[in-house]
Amino acid sequence: MRHTWRWFGPVDKVTVQDAAQAGAEGIVSALHHITTGDVWPVDEITKRHEAIKAGGLYWDVVESVPVSEDIKTQTGDWKNHIANWQETLRRLSASGIRTVCYNFMPVLDWTRTDLRWETRHGARAMRFDLTDFAAFDIHILKRPDAKADYPDWLLEEAAKRFAEMPDTKIAALGRNIGAGLPGSADGYTLAQLLEKLRSYHGINRGRLQQNLIDFLSEVTPVAEEVGINICAHGDDPPWPLLGLPRILSTEADYAHMLSQVDSRANGVTLCTGSLGARADNDLPFIAGRFADRIHFVHLRNVTRDTDTVPCSFFEDEHLEGGTDMVAVIAALITEEARRRAEGRDDHTIPMRPDHGQEILDDLTRGAQPGYPAIGRLKGLAELRGIERTLSHGRFGLATGKG
């Protein structure tokens, strides 16, 4: 695999040079300052390439070209936004980009209730607490009919939790849940979030699935034409939130998407942390089943409080948690060997250590939530060690790698 590192641009407190020192071979980045739905300007794409080269690395993967809410709901200026997405692919390809990640989560991107939860050894990790989330939905956001989405026991727990919740915790929940895309300055107030939720009235799971297929039917031919692999990131967490449907949460969801637009250019961002929040997602099996269409990998682990769906969980160390990371990496390097033997030019799959706990100096550095320097360095080193061991000519898998 090609070891990459997410960089949020010049505002990122973790530099490209830091990434290189951590062992990264390439950078994952995006133009977060460009308004969602607009075409990415050529000069801005060039500036990002140059900024990354100045740090000693190259821009390997775009994460993400955001998909607008207009496209997801097929309202407003959605057709023009699709045309702009297509043109952005053309411009990225002309600059040398070959992999573009995106997601189709409605309204909210990845959602956590606590961005700096203290672990058993004093590190800080991101956590999704189901009771806190229900308390937010019912008692803080006050979403109409929210109570119908939760079982009686959780309604009771959420009411009790909210009654004991200090004002600082109430404010923090609103900030954490209403945050926008990672790297983006955008976010929602409670009123704005309720308004966004209303825009999905009448859009059920089947309708949102079809809107995704309609989007892919338009952009995949352009991706094929310009030599880019587009890859869908899963829902995080992988179940409905705030009454909104989610459509990339399971093996079956991905199978549907890939079969409906059956092109190698239409592929998967395999995020083990996102899908791993569900106990019924067998990540090594999923990695093997969709291996031919995996274009980008996020390796992350979570520990669930229970095996129910939904559940509470936290982002554990990369080799801890519920996902067998050794088995996942074995499936990926086996696929790389198969592609190499087939002569595919995309035989090396870009991977990044997804998120990381705040440890050591991370605790005072103040990086983007989930993206500390030392926590990710540790994760990348551990993952690299597994890959090197499995790829060893004498002791590892027969990968055919020279």
Curated annotation (Swiss-Prot):
GO BP field: D-glucuronate catabolic process
Substrates-to-products reaction catalysed: D-mannonate = 2-dehydro-3-deoxy-D-gluconate + H2O
Pathway it works in: Carbohydrate metabolism; pentose and glucuronate interconversion
Cofactor(s) listed in the protein's UniProt record: Fe(2+); Mn(2+)
E.C. no: 4.2.1.8
Top class in the EC scheme: lyase
Signal peptide: none
Gene Ontology MF term list: ferrous iron binding; manganese ion binding; mannonate dehydratase activity
Alphabetic keyword roster: Iron, Lyase, Manganese
Family note: Belongs to the mannonate dehydratase family.
Function per UniProt: Catalyzes the dehydration of D-mannonate.
Alphabetized PANTHER family for the sequence: MANNONATE DEHYDRATASE (PTHR30387:SF2)
Protein name per UniProt: Mannonate dehydratase 1
Organism: Agrobacterium fabrum (strain C58 / ATCC 33970) (Agrobacterium tumefaciens (strain C58))
Gene this chain is encoded by: uxuA1
